[in-house]
Swiss-Prot record:
The lineage of its organism: Eukaryota, Rhodophyta, Bangiophyceae, Cyanidiales, Cyanidiaceae. GO terms for biological process: photosynthesis. The keyword Chloroplast applies. This is Photosystem II reaction center protein T. PSII is composed of 1 copy each of membrane proteins PsbA, PsbB, PsbC, PsbD, PsbE, PsbF, PsbH, PsbI, PsbJ, PsbK, PsbL, PsbM, PsbT, PsbY, PsbZ, Psb30/Ycf12, at least 3 peripheral proteins of the oxygen-evolving complex and a large number of cofactors. It forms dimeric complexes. It comes from Cyanidioschyzon merolae (strain NIES-3377 / 10D).
Length: 32
């Protein structure tokens, strides 16, 4: 059970960092 909690926290942190960088700089590659 503890492993699932740590994995969930890790994924959550990575998504927060990803969205922070994604919205801070306007993506040029993602424009389709």
């Amino acid at each position: 059970m503890e492993a699932l909690v740590y994995v969930f926290l890790l994924i959550g942190t990575l998504m927060i960092i990803f969205f922070a960088i994604f919205f801070r700089e306007p993506p040029r590659i993602a424009k389709k």
